[in-house]
Amino acid sequence: MEKEKKGARELDLLDIVQFVAPGTPLRAGIENVLRANTGGLIVVGYNDKVKSVVDGGFHINSAFSPAHLYELAKMDGAIILSDSGQKILYANTQLMPDATIHSSETGMRHRTAERVAKQTGCLIIAISERRNVITLYQGNRRYTLKDIGFILTKANQAIQTLEKYKTILDHAISALSALEFEELVTFGDVLSVLHRYEMVLRIKNEINMYIKELGTEGHLIRLQVNELITDMEQEAALFIKDYVKEKIKDPYVLLKQLQDMSSFELLDDSILYKLLGYPASTNIDEYVYTRGYRLLHKIPRLPMPIVENVVEAFGVLDRIMEADVQDLDEVEGIGEVRAKKIKKGLKRLQEKHYIDRQL
């Protein structure tokens, strides 16, 4: 598998947390060690750098099981697993990292874990004997796994926040859609909706972290998120395609740049203008016209390639609305039936958003 080829040492934080999430054999073994109050040190991955810090121990090379991990953790030394975590390679080893590597930890086990992680780049799992805490180290990163009850509480709070922000976003999008049909959208409206999309996506990403950490316990949270914001990334990407200055093939690149921004950058209009390809001095009250990707995509059973062809042919939503059935029929991939469907679909959306705006 691709993930096994990469090795645990190359995984990002979400993957690392999922690697030891409830429901995995590794987490089951770690929980056994926690309950026994023996503590432990586990290295995931074995390469030349790991070899250079390992001393002693004995070769196991057997399939991983929670019971084996529990028994081997009774000994003082570290346990070394394969990159995939599916094999126990060595047990009762002594780890001797470079003592000059800075460590902010105080306990011997955690100090060793931090130094080995920095020196080797591998995932190191330190199980505290007294505090019943699981700490993950990889490179310069440190992450303490939290109690499942605590994570569930935080996840449910985040779900409630997501619901509120999603409601605000829905109102903003509905108002924007009405303005799009009336050709009254300003750059201020665009930036406002862009902010709201990003806030919803950030909350979703935070909840995804909780879901990964919860493992099998996060199933209901995942269902709630999926029900709340299905296809949110796609809608945000189409919104960007509607308003970016120059046409782009992959709006997800800009969406990723948006999500990588700090909270301060997100509040800076000039940075958002630059992201969309406009001058930083753009007037917030200046009118801007949608291409129509997002609204056309809302018409049932209208494939994205057809949406692309329509926008390519007419340029902006206003011209699409002005086009008659014959004009639409001339677009590649659109026959008379589909042309009528587009006209009726846009008319229905226009009426819906007009009514929503009056409520």
Swiss-Prot record:
Binding site for ATP: 77, 95, 108-112
Reaction equations catalysed: 2 ATP = 3',3'-c-di-AMP + 2 diphosphate
Record keywords, A-Z: ATP-binding, DNA damage, DNA repair, DNA-binding, Magnesium, Nucleotide-binding, Nucleotidyltransferase, Transferase
Family matches, as InterPro entries: DisA, DisA_sf, DNA_integrity_DisA_N_sf, DNA_integrity_scan_DisA_link, DNA_integrity_scan_DisA_N, DNA_integrity_scanning_protein, RuvA_2-like
Gene3D superfamilies xrefs: 5' to 3' exonuclease, C-terminal subdomain, DNA integrity scanning linker region, DNA integrity scanning protein, DisA, N-terminal domain
GO BP annotations, alphabetical order: DNA repair
Span of domain DAC: 10-148
Cofactor(s) required, per the database record: Mg(2+)
Keyword DNA repair: yes
GO molecular function, one term: DNA binding
Enzyme class: transferase
EC number: 2.7.7.85
PROSITE patterns: DAC
Family: Belongs to the DisA family.
Function noted in UniProt: Participates in a DNA-damage check-point that is active prior to asymmetric division when DNA is damaged. DisA forms globular foci that rapidly scan along the chromosomes during sporulation, searching for lesions. When a lesion is present, DisA pauses at the lesion site. This triggers a cellular response that culminates in a temporary block in sporulation initiation.
HAMAP family: DisA (MF_01438)
Name the record gives this protein: DNA integrity scanning protein DisA
Organism lineage string: Bacteria, Bacillati, Bacillota, Bacilli, Bacillales
